[in-house]
């Protein structure tokens, strides 16, 4: 994963998370989606009409706040340059900082990762984010079918998520060793029950996967399981012929449930190299492989150690948890050249802002203020770009991501060379 792609995706997700937390007092927050090709002059004309309509709002404060938000958007439109290749999204409104009377106008201009297709103007108590959230959904998915004579699991691997869709059991008894006509008849009944079970598995797989294939959201199907049943399933007429065309491979496995899915994903890693889950897993497993070497290998973890390695240009791959909610802040004196840098979490940042109101410069006694506040992962990504290191952000929702967050405090690295002998 390229550092710039990982950085942009992280910042986009962080922005959506922040916007989702904004709540207005009444229906005062405006969301404006401008599609590619829409003339800015037409949008401005529509907003002026909405400004006129807003004058009919009964509540004086709501009327004032809505009109102020529209005016803020109109001012931002003047700064946009046509043509808008992907369109643009603008959010504006009076957002309370704490209690009543603490409202402040906030305006956000977002360039979407993909083209906006529909013009939307919405005034509500919260920003309308669904069209942007759709961009975060992984478009491509892989179907997984694990099957043996006793049970089957049908699942979908999409981005970082493994979603188990169906679990089926056969009730087929094991083979009998005893001979005789009755034993042969019983064996035929067992084979028939196994055949009917595979038909049921195929039917459920068709129900789950065909709609995704028709929507062009299914890239392939992986089939696995212990024994020969998986081969019978693929070679027989159990799966729809269009789905059979996208069966990528079959895999010998020990399990047919959740453990089997993880076993299959490991064996299918070369086929799934573009799936986000596999990128995370590969990076974390590389790190752990280095970590358990007797000499410590090329592994490094902990904020101080990783930062040192980044500054030296020794990091090959930086692994950071998305839950690492920290900020890099610069504190400067308003009178002299005093400058201080700190790394703080969200609560510490709020506390620091309050403390600085009464703080004095240790150099000249002047007033201190925060002159720069940067998301910590954004700061780390810039260090990666300077040294050519790869950045991988991991979600705490995955097993590997949770390990990085909990066991290594959210930050780890694979080195190019050892920095301490």
UniProtKB/Swiss-Prot annotation:
Q: Which InterPro entries match?
A: eFR1_2_sf, eRF1_1_Pelota, eRF1_1_sf, eRF1_2, eRF1_3, Peptide_chain-rel_aRF1, Peptide_chain-rel_eRF1/aRF1, Ribosomal_eL30-like_sf
Q: Give an example GO molecular function.
A: sequence-specific mRNA binding
List keywords of the entry alphabetically.
Cytoplasm, Protein biosynthesis
Major subcellular site: cytoplasm
**UniProt-annotated location(s):** Cytoplasm
* GO CC annotation: cytosol; translation release factor complex
Looking up Gene3D superfamilies in the UniProt record yields: 3.30.1330.30, eRF1 domain 1, eRF1 domain 2
**Do you know which Pfam families this protein is assigned to?**
eRF1_1 (PF03463), eRF1_2 (PF03464), eRF1_3 (PF03465)
**What family is reported?**
Belongs to the eukaryotic release factor 1 family.
State the NCBIfam families in the record: aRF1_eRF1
Task: Provide the assembly information.
Answer: Heterodimer of two subunits, one of which binds GTP.
Q: By its UniProt entry, which PANTHER family does this protein fall under? A: PEPTIDE CHAIN RELEASE FACTOR SUBUNIT 1 (PTHR10113)
Which HAMAP family does this entry report, sorted A to Z? Rel_fact_arch_1
Which purpose does this protein serve, as stated in its record?
Answer: Directs the termination of nascent peptide synthesis (translation) in response to the termination codons UAA, UAG and UGA.
Q: Per its record, how is this protein called by name? A: Peptide chain release factor subunit 1
Q: What is the originating organism of this protein?
A: Methanocaldococcus jannaschii (strain ATCC 43067 / DSM 2661 / JAL-1 / JCM 10045 / NBRC 100440) (Methanococcus jannaschii)
Q: Which gene encodes it?
A: prf1
